[in-house]
Regions:
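A donor-sugar binding/catalytic signature common to diverse glycosyltransferases
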Residues: 104-152
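C-terminal amphipathic helix plus adjacent low-complexity
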Residues: 1-21, 158-255
Length: 255
């Protein structure tokens, strides 16, 4: 898909938003993926509950902030669910609410860091990614990158809604205290140092239409073409983690 690239002026004009107002992006989640894992503090039971509560709160707010909702890029599980961001938006946000928009799926994401004054997520990687770019990120506490000093974290539904209602006030108080250098370090550790391209694995979406025969053909092909040295490297690094009782797998090629 070819994405439309817009300059700031054109973007705000296209979405009929006031460019003088603060702009906050809210990143929705894949509504089926990771609902039950990776959270030591459970604020919402699932991503759909969080999305609905967020939209309901936005519906009650004034128009002093531009709120732009971004759908998750993954198609995982969409064939198995009856709702999505667009449907929830249509059901909850009134047509008179001119400052709450959905980011068009044919627009390039390159514009986001150029115009975002803040971003919000429940527990997605966007909170880490945009923190690396020195954009204040509101996330729930108790997720895999929280507690490091580079995000603004909410520990309850009440605190989350307070942040939504008082976004500019909270930003003025907390923005300059955020440590984006820690975000960059955490991103490298998680997506560089602890990642390894296993020669026998490939990206597979269980909601795709690949049948069993196609799946097995892909596996057999990977076995046939496998780089044995790469496999032995993975085996060595994994043994090092297990024997050392280490929490994390380390790809020593990237040290």
């Amino acid at each position: 898909q070819k994405f439309i690239k817009l300059k700031k002026e054109k973007f705000f004009k296209t979405l009929n938003l006031d460019k003088k107002k603060p702009t906050c992006f809210i990143f929705s989640h894949n509504l089926l993926d990771g609902n039950l894992g990776g959270k030591s503090i459970l604020i919402y039971n699932d991503y759909l509950s969080w999305l609905r509560e967020t939209l309901k709160c936005l519906e009650t707010l004034d128009n002093k902030v531009n709120w732009i909702l971004k759908e998750h890029p993954s198609n995982y599980g969409y064939l198995k669910i009856k709702t999505n961001l667009s449907k929830e938006y249509e059901n909850i946000i009134s047509r008179s609410k001119k400052n709450v928009k959905i980011f068009p799926d044919n627009f390039s994401r390159e514009i986001i860091p150029k115009i975002a004054d803040a971003i919000i997520t429940l527990g997605g990687t966007s909170g880490l990614e945009y923190a690396c770019l020195k954009i204040p990120s509101f996330t729930s506490a108790g997720i895999f990158y929280s507690g490091k000093g580079f995000t603004i974290e909410y520990k309850s539904k009440a605190q989350y809604k307070y942040y939504l209602r008082n976004l500019t006030r909270v930003l003025a108080k907390k923005k300059n205290k955020l440590k984006s250098n820690r975000a960059i370090m955490n991103y490298y550790l998680m997506y560089g140092l602890m990642r390894f391209d296993h020669p026998l694995l490939f990206d597979y979406d269980i909601s795709s239409k690949m049948n069993v025969d196609d799946f097995m053909k892909k596996i057999f092909k990977l076995n046939k073409e496998m780089n044995i040295n790469s496999y032995y490297k993975f085996e060595r690094y994994l043994k090092h983690q297990i024997n050392g009782n280490n929490i994390h797998f380390i790809n020593e090629d990237k040290i």
